[in-house]
Amino acid sequence: MNRLIDIIIILCTLTIVSACKDEDEEETIVWGDRTVIVYVSGENSLSSVVATDIEEMKRGSRLIGNNNLVVYVDRSYKSELPWLARIRDGQITDSVSVADIGIDKRDVDSSDPTVMKTVLHYAVRHYPARRDYGLVLWGHSTGWLSSDFSARRTRAYGIDNGHNSLSNTGNWMTIPDLQRVLSTVPHLKFIFADCCNFMCLESLYELRNVADYIIGSPAEIPEAGAFYTDVVPALFESTTFALSILNKYRPAEDICPPLAVVKTSEMENVAHATRNILQTIREDMRDSYPDMTGIIHYYNTNAKNGYLPEYNIFYDAGDFFRHHASEGDYRQWKESLNRAVVGKTMATRWETDKVWSVFYSDFTMTEDNYHGVSMFVPQDPSKGNYANFNQEIRKLAWYHAVNPGNNN
């Protein structure tokens, strides 16, 4: 059914466009078996590494066969409009600026859902796929968080900081907004999130109906992100793409973050299992907040006063249940999670914007306690940023799926 809907969307789009074009004006239409769109939101502190990744993509494109690699690039160059192009056989081809694709702005905000929608629709229209589509989200991410812990501004994916490459104080795109954009394009075979903290149950559940698989890290990733010379060919493997991306993410000699692959069709079952196990934990704990001591956490939001545990967030979902549920309940929940997390690679440490020995020495990563995904656990609102977080989580579908009696 998804394939039929995709074909209808493409044919309708092509019909509308052809009707609006002058008869003597030809559009570039290049079919591929798979089309992968790389959305580079680099108008921020990552601007300096965009060129390196583009060069890696060019090298990797020599091995992609009859497929389309399309890249949209927005970086902090005042003299350069954001542009979209196809990368083929080591070369950038068919390059167009945002003005050419209908975005009439001098300083384009790539975190604006309307901009992303326009870019993706252009890419699908000009580079349609015979088989399926993939999307790479390149940039910053703060998991499911929809507001900053220091100022009220939209967050979650992307960040557009104007022409400033020295900070990350601009606009972000929320995960619900991302979901709404992606629901307007053909169903995706996968989303590869090359950005920090993306593999949280909250975001995965929000995006469960727009892609078959989601690949990324529950933790921070290195500034350079994936090694695209090796990852680009993996993106186009017919059935083994997900595990290949995990295995080729960084060269063997580099520090690689923990990574995971989630099959989104299992997310409803994970939500159901989580609802059941949380209900039991709540009954046991009554009105107290759970002790998170020793549980894997993938970020700490405190940037001023050194390490304070009340600022930890993005706790490993399974490690939390190992600590706070009965062995039988945990085992039953894990069976549901294992059907969703179809691949994962562990790391005992990873690159971070914090001092590892200060912020992450309070837990030990092992194959047993690493589960590949994080989950929000409400904490005392008088501590850290949890007064805000405990309210923000209510904006997401995951919260209402696992807390059926708290729909306010």
Task: Give residue ranges: language-model regions.
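Structural recognition of the beta-strand scaffold that forms the well-ordered cores
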Residues: 35-39, 68-73, 133-137, 189-193, ...
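Phosphate/oxyanion-binding active-site loops and adjacent basic polyanion-contact surfaces
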Residues: 46-50, 108-116, 167-178
